[in-house]
Amino acid sequence: MKDRLEQLKAKQLTQDDDTDEVEIAIDNTAFMDEFFSEIEETRLNIDKISEHVEEAKKLYSIILSAPIPEPKTKDDLEQLTTEIKKRANNVRNKLKSMEKHIEEDEVRSSADLRIRKSQHSVLSRKFVEVMTKYNEAQVDFRERSKGRIQRQLEITGKKTTDEELEEMLESGNPAIFTSGIIDSQISKQALSEIEGRHKDIVRLESSIKELHDMFMDIAMLVENQGEMLDNIELNVMHTVDHVEKARDETKRAMKYQGQARKKLIIIIVVVVVLLGILALIIGLSVGLK
């Protein structure tokens, strides 16, 4: 009788273990289904951002090719810019949430965890690539718009240097150079384009600053992802090159007071931040090796 009781107890324990394993498997399957659903949603958002970036590039070209762009074109661009920011913030938050959950499960090494890490890394890299293209398109549009302003000023008989033009853009007041323009039909058209391009650049710079903040956040998000370090380091190096060029231009403009001095301070702060990020990346790269 005693042996029979032990057999029944052992059988019951085995059944309980089997039940626990089934419950764990079911829970894990449900969790991974939810994870892949989030991955797909995030991937679709990144693809949509990529489409919007291509549309924005087309609108940039249209605006640059027309002396006085249609208001609807600018409205369409404004809507696209808003949509890109909205989706980009959504993607960033999703990736950060995924990273948090991965860190919480880091103590448990499993095939599922490796899959989640891999998917997170792929999406992060794709997101950086898309947003880098957007940043490049914005910077290109700004430079070409600035060139159009410079040419229109020359038409009116006012020649300006790059430093003087940057001073005008930072002041937010095109009247610094447009005041006193001869009252002729050609000058009026040129003046209208100058003011329009100036407004475009002011709006664009606000977006570029927001994008810069997002890039800093992304850099923190992917800093421990091995191969992602090379991509971020490359992006930072390109940015540093642009900042170094701007700093050299600022040195030549030291004679200007007020806004020019403010510009130098801003550039120095940006350089320090970027060099700090670059140092962090190099340190992490050495650590990973």
From Swiss-Prot:
Cytoplasmic side, ranges: 1-263
GO biological process: exocytic insertion of neurotransmitter receptor to postsynaptic membrane; exocytosis; intracellular protein transport; long-term synaptic potentiation; modulation of chemical synaptic transmission; neurotransmitter transport; organelle membrane fusion; positive regulation of cell adhesion
Start and end residues of each t-SNARE coiled-coil homology domain: 191-253
Membrane topology designation: Single-pass type IV membrane protein
Signal peptide: none
Protein's cellular compartments: Membrane
Major localization listed first in the record, in broad terms: membrane
Alphabetical keyword list: Cell projection, Coiled coil, Membrane, Neurotransmitter transport, Transmembrane, Transmembrane helix, Transport
MF annotations from Gene Ontology: SNAP receptor activity
Tissue: Expressed in the retina (at protein level).
Record topological domains on the Extracellular side: 284-289
GO cellular component, one term: ribbon synapse
Listed transmembrane segments: 264-283
Cross-referenced Pfam families: SNARE, Syntaxin
Subunit: Interacts with REEP6. Isoform 3B interacts with PRPH2 in rod and cone photoreceptors. Isoform 3B interacts with ROM1. Isoform 3B interacts with SNAP25. Isoform 3B interacts with VAMP2.
Family affiliation: Belongs to the syntaxin family.
Task performed by this protein: Potentially involved in docking of synaptic vesicles at presynaptic active zones. Apical receptor involved in membrane fusion of apical vesicles. Essential for survival of retinal photoreceetors.
Protein name (database record): Syntaxin-3
Species annotation: Mus musculus
